[in-house]
């Protein structure tokens, strides 16, 4: 519980930070600090949501997955929000697969605790409604991105969004992860990442990505990145 107390003053989760003291203390008193492993699946599509997670660092992916196991990224959640919002609906069923993309520290809260706090109608309810608007916008924009933009544009966009979520220009993402996120063969990712590296936009080695020239990478990305920045 010590880690949870630190987050109330350390502002590691922006949504919790924005709550009045009485509301955040109610949530923190019912929270459990957890360390999510890389590629740990929190929910599969169709699962009943029993817990919600407030990331303190790292990033969690929202994925649409077919019966054959193919996936496509719809959104990325960092410490600006939380995952498991469908727990506030009836029935509380996960519409998408939710996976920790990298090792992530988070606060885990029982779904019924969030439902109770939401029904109080305080600041938490207001922030959740605003945050859900951002999430829905990101998912809608993702559909446009995957349909109309090139793989290179999409890759640049999601690299930038990932960096924003983890709040550093250097982070871990394997080519296999990127392939799954974008729903394209790994060879496509290898080829495009090599071009980005040759052009001096990124450094990529052993699953470690470093954005070297953010300004030029933003120019290589589709307009979806600017939309994502405005929604954040």
Cite the ranges covered by each PLM segment.
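Cyclic nucleotide-binding regulatory domains
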Residues: 40-102
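Short aromatic/basic micro-patch
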Residues: 18, 76, 108, 172, ...
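Cyclic-nucleotide recognition modules
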Residues: 75-133, 137, 141
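Alpha-helix/helix-capping structural signal
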Residues: 22, 57, 81, 112-113, ...
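Polybasic "coupling" helices that flank or enter modular domains
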Residues: 101-103, 118-185
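Phosphate-/nucleic-acid-contacting segments
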Residues: 161-232
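Cyclic nucleotide-binding regulatory module and flanking cytosolic helices
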Residues: 1-37, 82, 87-89
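Residues that scaffold the ATP/ADP-binding catalytic core of kinase and kinase-like folds
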Residues: 27, 63, 85-86, 116-117, ...
């Amino acid at each position: 519980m010590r880690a949870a107390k630190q987050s109330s003053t350390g502002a590691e989760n922006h949504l919790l930070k924005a709550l009045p003291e009485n509301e955040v203390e109610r949530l923190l008193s019912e929270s459990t600090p957890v360390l999510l492993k890389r590629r740990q699946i929190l929910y599969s599509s169709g699962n009943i949501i029993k817990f919600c997670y407030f990331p303190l660092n790292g990033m969690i992916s929202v994925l649409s997955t077919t019966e054959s196991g193919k996936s496509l990224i719809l959104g990325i959640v960092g410490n600006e929000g939380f995952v498991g919002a469908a727990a506030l609906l009836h029935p509380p069923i996960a519409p998408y697969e939710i996976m920790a993309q990298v090792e992530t520290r988070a606060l885990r809260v029982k779904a019924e605790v969030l439902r109770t706090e939401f029904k109080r109608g305080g600041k938490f309810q207001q922030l959740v409604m605003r945050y859900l608007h951002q999430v829905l916008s990101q998912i809608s924009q993702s559909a446009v991105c995957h349909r109309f933009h090139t793989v290179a544009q999409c890759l640049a966009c999601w690299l930038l969004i990932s960096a924003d979520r983890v709040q550093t220009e250097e982070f871990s993402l394997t080519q296999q992860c990127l392939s799954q996120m974008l729903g394209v063969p790994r060879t496509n990712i290898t080829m495009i990442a090599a071009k980005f590296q040759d052009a001096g936009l990124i450094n990529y080695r052993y699953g470690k990505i470093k954005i070297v020239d953010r300004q030029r990478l933003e120019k290589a990305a589709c307009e979806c990145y600017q939309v994502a920045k405005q929604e954040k």
